[in-house]
């Protein structure tokens, strides 16, 4: 019963995880780029299955390769992000510099432009509050329009350096892979357990019992890795 429950739960988690990854791509593209160690985006981008980040790469501005070694599933990241194998997925550099055409047909703003709009929104809010306090309705209406136009970038107004917008790539990248690899491991473990149980061998298979026992902490590790990805990469 526990193996059946574990298998169903693991499959559901992967299914909901796919939906979460899609939402990340839509709402927090910088997190997705950090999860994949993706500095330069493009069309038909592959998903890194296994990879070792290059420790010599310390800035998005340097010319170092992002990886020492990596194996990718062709075009899978584009499908994960946009449900289109050939869709464009921006990388860290693209998100900072802007200027690319999004899949919605709009031109992406640069980080500096977003920061300026954020500062404009912050100032407009202060001016609006002052105008309301002074009962200057005309000025208040004007400042409110400015605030509403720039409000989507309000938080950017507190950013001093565009590099602050980049999550810790190494921590996010490896945590994501720990979570995914353990999730796949659990599915395999539960399938093997069910097969052995159906054959009536599980009671006498000590190694499988030990693997099941030793796997208990891995569930907590997978959960914590997921939280690291969620919080460290938050935008």
Language-model segments: residues:
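Juxtamembrane interface at the cytosolic side of transmembrane helices
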Residues: 1, 181-222
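Hydrophobic alpha-helical membrane-insertion segments
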Residues: 5-13, 132, 213-233
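Aromatic-rich transmembrane-lumenal/periplasmic boundary elements in polytopic membrane proteins
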Residues: 5-119
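Transmembrane helix-loop junctions and nearby membrane-interface residues
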Residues: 11-21, 191-201, 224-230
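Membrane-interface interhelical connector segments
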Residues: 92-93, 97, 110-113, 121-133, ...
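Membrane-proximal extracellular juxtamembrane segment immediately upstream
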Residues: 140-171, 175, 182, 217-235
């Amino acid at each position: 019963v526990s193996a059946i429950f574990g298998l169903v739960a693991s499959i559901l988690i992967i299914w909901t995880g796919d939906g979460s990854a899609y939402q990340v791509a839509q709402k927090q593209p910088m997190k997705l780029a950090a999860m994949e160690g993706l500095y330069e985006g493009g069309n038909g981008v592959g998903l890194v299955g296994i990879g070792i980040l290059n420790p010599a790469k310390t800035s998005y501005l340097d010319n170092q390769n992002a990886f020492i070694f990596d194996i990718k599933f062709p075009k899978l990241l584009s499908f994960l992000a946009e449900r289109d194998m050939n869709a464009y997925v921006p990388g860290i550099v693209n998100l900072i510099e802007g200027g690319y055409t999004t899949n919605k047909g709009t031109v992406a703003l640069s980080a500096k432009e977003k920061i300026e709009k954020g500062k404009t929104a912050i100032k407009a809010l202060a001016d609006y509050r002052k105008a309301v306090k002074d009962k200057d309705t005309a000025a208040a209406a004007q400042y409110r329009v400015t605030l509403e136009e720039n409000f989507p970038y309000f938080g950017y107004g507190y950013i001093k350096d565009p590099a602050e917008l980049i999550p810790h790539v190494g921590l996010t990248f490896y945590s994501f892979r720990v979570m995914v690899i353990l999730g796949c491991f659990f599915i395999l473990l539960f399938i093997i357990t069910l097969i052995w149980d159906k054959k009536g061998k599980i009671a006498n298979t000590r190694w499988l019992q030990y693997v099941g026992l030793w796997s208990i902490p891995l569930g907590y590790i997978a959960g914590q890795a997921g939280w690291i990805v969620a919080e460290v990469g938050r935008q």
